[in-house]
């Protein structure tokens, strides 16, 4: 990176301070004080738009794993005892109620009291379990969590790995028999392979490799990176293809700006964790292409990120919370990789939008969706998909990346 392209210390420190305050005084404070359940344990599955918790709501493995990951990562990075306490609360509930003691892996959904409601074994949820458990091990050294993460990895590789075409069967029943319907939700295309699931397998395997650098895991992680470069990333457009058949033939024309910018930094993180220097230039090229395409096509005049371009070419201009969070990290990452100041300015712009429109200054946390005119939708603050992972992780990543930039400035 050219030193002439680094913003001055004042700008870097100001952004870092704002991000730190948002993380500790809004996001994590909300989750630590407004969402834990003193009756059933763990965390509630729903908080309404009015901020009222619904302790009897069903609980999803994805939300609970994301809560565990967020507080474990916050404790590891910031050292605040409360964050360890919250992570341990999430860990205890997750292991007690989501883990299938008979067949292994984690259930899709349980009741508040822990009774299984949906026993599917979706690879997306298994991946978040690995991601969270390996982070808890990173933060505390807990060996039981690492053993559980490894067991889930083994189950994925045994029952879901496609040794012919690459990638993974995405959904199984409780006993790990493949399911025909692999969709995460009703809005997904009815196709057997998706970018989304494979992105989060890659994310999880990279975190597991940090604490368990095993040869087979390295090979599987490298195969995932190469799958993205070969089939999922489209070099002609700078976007990710979202859905495929079993042979990785495209079955989608939609564009997800949030996933594009998220993948732009997760792919580089994975190749760096793996230490694959020969593969890195190709990943960096794809990463910067994804970031440039997002900047050119997905950014609104106010600096925020539009949601997506649908299958029929319609631009969805709503501002969902998670693409804004991923844009903060992705644009900072693109700046660190390229030295091009327009990426740093894009990160500042999306942060300004977050502070002015996406965060809820009265009720806490962030609005799930905001209209093009700046008005928030009356969506739940916490639900099956809305957790502290995207915005919490974005803040943790930004703090760390800004620290590195400040060190670079001081060393000049």
From Swiss-Prot:
Optimum temperature is 80 degrees Celsius. One of its GO terms (molecular function) is cellobiose epimerase activity. Its EC number is 5.1.3.11. Coiled coil: none annotated. GO terms for biological process: carbohydrate metabolic process. It is an enzyme of class 5 (isomerase). Pfam families: GlcNAc_2-epim. The keyword Isomerase applies. Gene3D superfamilies: 1.50.10.10. Keywords: Isomerase. Optimum pH is 6.3. Catalyzes the reversible epimerization of cellobiose to 4-O-beta-D-glucopyranosyl-D-mannose (Glc-Man). Can also use lactose, epilactose, mannobiose and cellotriose. Highly specific for oligosaccharides linked by the beta-1,4-glycosidic linkage. Shows preference for lactose. PANTHER family: N-ACYLGLUCOSAMINE-2-EPIMERASE (PTHR15108). Belongs to the cellobiose 2-epimerase family. This is Cellobiose 2-epimerase. The gene is ce.
